[in-house]
């Protein structure tokens, strides 16, 4: 029976697979993706993560984000988030 059903499908919810009630499966299935765990960076004593987000390169200036480069000079991204359709 394990080879008949795809991974994540409860056989009790769909006894005649592949003819299933999609609303019932969506209601009772867990579709939340697993969040991978990433260990936090180990900052040495005296170095604040807020002051140096790209440690150990604290002296280097972080490049501008992609959304900042797309706006022309004088247009702030927070003032007009859907540029060029500003109101």
Curated annotation (Swiss-Prot):
Sequence repeats, residue ranges: 5-20, 43-58, 71-86
Organism expressing this protein natively: Blaberus craniifer
Source taxon at top rank: Eukaryota
Disulfide feature: 14-20, 52-58, 80-86
One Pfam family here: CPCFC
UniProt entry tagged with the keyword Flavoprotein: no
Entry keyword annotation includes Acyltransferase: no
Protein name (Swiss-Prot/TrEMBL): Cuticle protein 1
Keywords: Cuticle, Disulfide bond, Pyrrolidone carboxylic acid, Repeat
Record-listed Pyrrolidone carboxylic acid modification sites: 1
MF annotations from Gene Ontology: structural constituent of cuticle
């Amino acid at each position: 029976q394990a080879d008949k059903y795809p991974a994540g499908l409860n056989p009790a919810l769909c006894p005649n697979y592949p003819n299933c009630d999609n609303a019932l499966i969506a209601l009772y299935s867990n579709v939340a993706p697993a969040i991978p765990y990433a260990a936090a960076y180990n900052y040495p004593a005296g170095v604040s993560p807020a002051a140096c987000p790209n440690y150990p390169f604290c002296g280097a200036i972080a490049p501008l984000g992609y959304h900042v480069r797309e706006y022309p000079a004088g247009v702030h991204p927070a003032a007009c988030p859907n540029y060029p359709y500003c109101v």
